């Protein structure tokens, strides 16, 4: 049964999972992010490392897609992708991005802004060969973001490539790479009762962070 669109405006719930107080904050935003990611993982949230990545094309049109966080440091978020993809084309023209982690089971959201730099090939190469072999193969057979005539074409290319590399190492694709997002700001949102949510934003200032509470 399809949802009755007349009822969409009535879909809502109360957020009762907890609060975020100033005393809960850490000196570095990545410390709080690490705690929240840990809690999301152990709350059995599917794909807790999934993050919505927003980029902008040369006309100013924004695009979004979900990618997976693969590592992070005190200053950076790291992900990997096809360097011929639409997102990579955007990043070549405009390195500014925004990320959003949504962990709605525990009523939390983290929004990050920053700019990207490409990862060195040595680091990309090391990560590529930690991926399952089938995932390595799919990198070769998918010309990401390009129009294809059918799914069958893609699957046939996959099976052919897999057969040809059954007992061989998959070569490293030069068109595949990674990015580090240099964090400029990080906002933490905790859903609250009566829509009185808790929001705190960390904004980079020189070599430190300024922290502000935001109105929901």
Swiss-Prot record:
Class of the enzyme per the UniProt entry, highest EC level: oxidoreductase
The positions annotated for binding FMN are 65-70, 80-81, 86-87, 109, 144-145, 189, 199
How many and how are cofactors bound here? Answer: Binds 1 FMN per subunit.
- Give the UniProt keywords, A-Z: Flavoprotein, FMN, Oxidoreductase, Pyridoxine biosynthesis
Q: Which Pfam families match?
A: PNP_phzG_C, PNPOx_N
The EC number on file is 1.4.3.5
Instruction: List residues binding substrate.
Output: 12-15, 70, 127, 131, 195-197
Indicate the family of this protein. Belongs to the pyridoxamine 5'-phosphate oxidase family.
* Protein name, per record: Pyridoxine/pyridoxamine 5'-phosphate oxidase
* Species name: Blochmanniella pennsylvanica (strain BPEN)
């Amino acid at each position: 049964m399809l949802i009755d669109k007349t009822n969409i405006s009535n879909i809502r719930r109360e957020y009762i999972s907890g609060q975020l107080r100033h005393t809960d904050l850490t000196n570095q935003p990545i410390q709080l992010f690490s705690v929240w990611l840990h809690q999301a993982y152990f709350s059995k949230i599917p794909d807790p490392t999934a993050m919505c990545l927003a980029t902008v094309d040369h006309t100013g049109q924004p695009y979004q897609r979900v990618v997976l966080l693969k590592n992070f440091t005190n200053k950076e978020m790291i992900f990997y992708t096809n360097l011929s993809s639409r997102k990579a084309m955007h990043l070549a023209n405009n390195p500014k991005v925004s990320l959003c982690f949504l962990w709605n089971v525990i009523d939390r959201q983290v929004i990050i802004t920053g700019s990207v730099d490409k990862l060195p090939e040595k680091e990309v190469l090391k990560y590529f060969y930690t991926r399952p072999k089938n995932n390595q193969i799919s990198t070769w057979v998918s010309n990401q973001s390009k129009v294809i005539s059918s799914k069958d074409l893609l699957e046939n290319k996959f099976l052919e490539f897999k057969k040809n590399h059954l007992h061989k190492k998959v070569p490293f694709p030069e068109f595949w790479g990674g990015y580090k997002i240099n964090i400029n700001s990080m906002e933490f949102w905790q859903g609250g009762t009566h829509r009185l949510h808790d929001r705190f934003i960390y904004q980079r200032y020189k070599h430190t962070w300024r922290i502000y509470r935001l109105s929901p």
